[in-house]
Amino acid sequence: MAFQKAVKGTILVGGGALATVLGLSQFAHYRRKQMNLAYVKAADCISEPVNREPPSREAQLLTLQNTSEFDILVIGGGATGSGCALDAVTRGLKTALVERDDFSSGTSSRSTKLIHGGVRYLQKAIMKLDIEQYRMVKEALHERANLLEIAPHLSAPLPIMLPVYKWWQLPYYWVGIKLYDLVAGSNCLKSSYVLSKSRALEHFPMLQKDKLVGAIVYYDGQHNDARMNLAIALTAARYGAATANYMEVVSLLKKTDPQTGKVRVSGARCKDVLTGQEFDVRAKCVINATGPFTDSVRKMDDKDAAAICQPSAGVHIVMPGYYSPESMGLLDPATSDGRVIFFLPWQKMTIAGTTDTPTDVTHHPIPSEEDINFILNEVRNYLSCDVEVRRGDVLAAWSGIRPLVTDPKSADTQSISRNHVVDISESGLITIAGGKWTTYRSMAEDTINAAVKTHNLKAGPSRTVGLFLQGGKDWSPTLYIRLVQDYGLESEVAQHLAATYGDKAFEVAKMASVTGKRWPIVGVRLVSEFPYIEAEVKYGIKEYACTAVDMISRRTRLAFLNVQAAEEALPRIVELMGRELNWDDYKKQEQLETARKFLYYEMGYKSRSEQLTDRSEISLLPSDIDRYKKRFHKFDADQKGFITIVDVQRVLESINVQMDENTLHEILNEVDLNKNGQVELNEFLQLMSAIQKGRVSGSRLAILMKTAEENLDRRVPIPVDRSCGGL
């Protein structure tokens, strides 16, 4: 009882201080908003999309070429750039957006997949009485609620458990989390609560039990980041923005303002990356929303511009779904080096991350083995010793570059800005940098406000609060049932389509091929263990997918869930895209090779394959080597030193096991390091050595060969005197 009174007293004191800060900050926030909107001139805002469907990429390119001048040209198709385009076009501004790669090809698709207010920022705000940190949290919590509302199919609340291993931490964390709920106010998703040790283990049975005191559960949001980014860009296109991916800005256009005599940025020279065609896109205002590449565009404007971006790499890994409960995440608030690690269920898998390492800016960040192992070690610290955390259980890994920035207008140019920065150069180039995924909308609003004021544009107020993104307006939690009933899709596929496309899922279902089976009637899967279907490839092209990498990483999320499954699906994906886009054989092969290179370097396949090669010398006991050699030779009956698909088929037929040829090719390809269609004895021994060390989670070939050996050993010859054939 005394303990509860002490805790309540702490809350009252902390809450009183926070209420004072809250009141002052809200008044200041209101004044800032009024000042921002004072200069906005009346204009006709667009209340409904002008296009039922986004125009084709070809149509968008024609609009870019044939429009004499846009009001706004946004460079960058990530979350912030797409948000700027949507904010501008819905204010009635003539808007264009160009992206040198694909929408969400950079940092925006490589996040932790959380929509959060920032618990740690609130802790700093209270401990240091930092009003800026508090405002960041307040703004993020408002934006979190808005994002969950406007894209309900792509986002949902997620309970996150904070395990406590020291008794004094329980009231400390509880007060902090309750203040997080308090700051959220009406935007609080669900109230946080405390769990006893036994209840915590019920929810998270694989948790480390020793010294566990209890746990605190709070709520944040989770989303499908690349699909969310795409939904923002597609919504902007439907409202009339000319958006084009694979359009690179080669240089900025400039002209002298006749009224002031100053040189002003007046557009950009753009190059179609797919065809090489170049043309000018003119605009009254150009916005630089290029994330980690902020400085490269600023230097196009002014070659002497000081760098403001300090890039930091954040690595994440994906592990099998059994590593976490299906509907609850875990937060490690203090890792061995002071970082925060999240451990979250996502798309029926488990995401663990992230790291925070200074890096160079690159279009192709590669996850390092050091960072992967750091995350694995932190996971081991929090999971029960009964759970063996193996390197081979890493199904995919990626690195995203955080565009941390310094404010060029600040007196202390060395300090990292914890919020976003809107900078206006002497020539009128507007740069938006920093911030985080959750606050993309408010960042876009601030940026367009600055553009309207600086360039005297005629625009209405921002309308993006509550504006549904594509697929969200008519979505409901039971929409998938109609897909099952009306089209004959299997339930898992229907749920996936509803959660990916929202009310547009019916259009995908209409494209689905007949399976030829009694059930499901339609919906041929790309790979058996994931609910992605072939119709999504056709529909993905309508969503501006231009390459196989677009399809495996951002239209579907296969590359982020399992690199091997993505590689297995690639040939069929390329075949389907080739039909729609009229690719010849050379183009198809080029797409295959590019996509495999992407999986190998950027999605962790290289690190995964190194567990079998560079770092996996054969370290088996002599008895194990003999045992595996005997198993191998049961397949290699001709003593060739290698086995082929024919050898495997022969053994399987002898034990009455049927398996189609495509599956067998996939099974052998997993182990065929030389990619010569043969699995050599040395490759097989390397595989078994890696499995024993836990560097590889398992192999279908290894399991198949073990099962075949056991079946062959059981077939002992029947003695003549027991076969009814003796005399």
UniProtKB/Swiss-Prot annotation:
For this entry, the transit peptide stretch runs 1-42
User: Which CDD domains does this chain map to?
Assistant: EFh
Q: What is its main location?
A: mitochondrion
Q: Which residues carry this modification: Phosphotyrosine?
A: Y601
Q: What SMART domains does the database record attribute to this sequence?
A: EFh
Query: What's its EC?
Result: 1.1.5.3
Report any one BP term from Gene Ontology: camera-type eye development
Domain of life per record: Eukaryota
How the protein is activated or inhibited is described as: Calcium-binding enhance the activity of the enzyme.
Residues bound to Ca(2+): D672, N674, N676, Q678, E683
Q: Where in the cell is it found?
A: Mitochondrion
Tell me its cofactors: FAD
Record-linked SUPFAM superfamilies: EF-hand, FAD-linked reductases, C-terminal domain, FAD/NAD(P)-binding domain
Q: Which residues form a coiled coil?
A: none
| Reaction(s) catalysed (UniProt annotation) | a quinone + sn-glycerol 3-phosphate = dihydroxyacetone phosphate + a quinol
Keyword annotations: Calcium, FAD, Flavoprotein, Metal-binding, Mitochondrion, Oxidoreductase, Phosphoprotein, Repeat, Transit peptide
Molecular function per GO: calcium ion binding; glycerol-3-phosphate dehydrogenase (quinone) activity
Q: Report the InterPro entries cross-referenced here.
A: DAO_C, DAO_C_sf, EF-hand-dom_pair, EF_Hand_1_Ca_BS, EF_hand_dom, FAD-dep_OxRdtase, FAD/NAD-bd_sf, G3P_DH_FAD-dep
Q: Which residues form the EF-hand domain?
A: 623-658, 659-694
Determine if Oxidoreductase is one of this entry's keywords.
Answer: yes
Q: Where does FAD bind?
A: 71-99
This protein's GO cellular component annotations are:
mitochondrial inner membrane; mitochondrion
- Its biological function? Calcium-responsive mitochondrial glycerol-3-phosphate dehydrogenase which seems to be a key component of the pancreatic beta-cell glucose-sensing device.
Q: Which family does it belong to?
A: Belongs to the FAD-dependent glycerol-3-phosphate dehydrogenase family.
Would you tell me the protein name for this molecule? Glycerol-3-phosphate dehydrogenase, mitochondrial
The organism is: Homo sapiens (Human)
Name of encoding gene: GPD2
